[in-house]
């Protein structure tokens, strides 16, 4: 069964957590090692359109996933980010939370991560040549999936 993520169909091999209302997947073009996404299962474009149950499930999943990726990728902190609407930088019309494990000195200016996320998400900069291989993404998802079994 594939997962819908906006205009994209996501293969189960890159999904490492599925809850009642959410799923988590590895990123095809991570900003930092361990940069992953958590999304509601229902394809909902804006945060305001989610039900209270979906919001609770999404953020409980994000908390669990954050704990795992911080540990697995030897981070010391986390950045959680959501762009909600086109003016906020949302390019995939499906609510999603970016979770990025952080380390001291990973960016010269700490807030530069937001510039990197903005560039990362721009469709005009999104070439398949920049994506990781399906095999690499599946291997990362398999390693993360172990934490949730």
Swiss-Prot record:
The modification Phosphotyrosine is found at residues 114, 147. Residues 2-109 form the HIT domain. It catalyses: P(1),P(3)-bis(5'-adenosyl) triphosphate + H2O = AMP + ADP + 2 H(+); adenosine 5'-phosphosulfate + H2O = sulfate + AMP + 2 H(+); adenosine 5'-phosphosulfate + NH4(+) = adenosine 5'-phosphoramidate + sulfate + 2 H(+); adenosine 5'-phosphoramidate + H2O = AMP + NH4(+). Substrate binds at residues 8, 27, 83, 89-92, 98. GO terms for biological process: diadenosine triphosphate catabolic process; intrinsic apoptotic signaling pathway by p53 class mediator; negative regulation of proteasomal ubiquitin-dependent protein catabolic process; purine nucleotide metabolic process. It holds the Pfam family HIT. Phosphorylation at Tyr-114 by SRC is required for induction of apoptosis. The record marks 114 as: Important for induction of apoptosis. It is found in: Cytoplasm; Nucleus; Mitochondrion. Possesses dinucleoside triphosphate hydrolase activity. Cleaves P(1)-P(3)-bis(5'-adenosyl) triphosphate (Ap3A) to yield AMP and ADP. Can also hydrolyze P(1)-P(4)-bis(5'-adenosyl) tetraphosphate (Ap4A), but has extremely low activity with ATP. Exhibits adenylylsulfatase activity, hydrolyzing adenosine 5'-phosphosulfate to yield AMP and sulfate. Exhibits adenosine 5'-monophosphoramidase activity, hydrolyzing purine nucleotide phosphoramidates with a single phosphate group such as adenosine 5'monophosphoramidate (AMP-NH2) to yield AMP and NH2. Homodimer. Interacts with UBE2I. Interacts with MDM2. Interacts with CTNNB1. Identified in a complex with CTNNB1 and LEF1. This is Bis(5'-adenosyl)-triphosphatase. It comes from Bos taurus. The gene is FHIT.
């Amino acid at each position: 069964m594939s997962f819908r993520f906006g205009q994209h169909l996501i293969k189960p091999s890159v999904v490492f957590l599925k809850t009642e209302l959410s799923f988590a997947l590895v990123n095809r073009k991570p900003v930092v090692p361990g940069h992953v996404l958590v999304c509601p299962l229902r394809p909902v474009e804006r945060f305001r359109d989610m039900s209270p149950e979906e919001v609770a499930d999404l953020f409980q999943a994000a908390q669990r996933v954050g704990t795992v990726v911080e540990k697995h990728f030897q981070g010391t902190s986390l950045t959680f980010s959501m762009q909600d609407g086109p003016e906020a930088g949302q390019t995939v019309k499906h609510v999603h939370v970016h979770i990025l494990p952080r380390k001291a000195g990973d960016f010269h200016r700490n807030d530069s991560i937001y510039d990197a996320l903005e560039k990362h998400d721009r469709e005009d900069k999104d070439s398949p040549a920049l994506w990781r291989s399906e095999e690499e993404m599946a291997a990362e998802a398999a390693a993360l999936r172990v934490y949730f079994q």
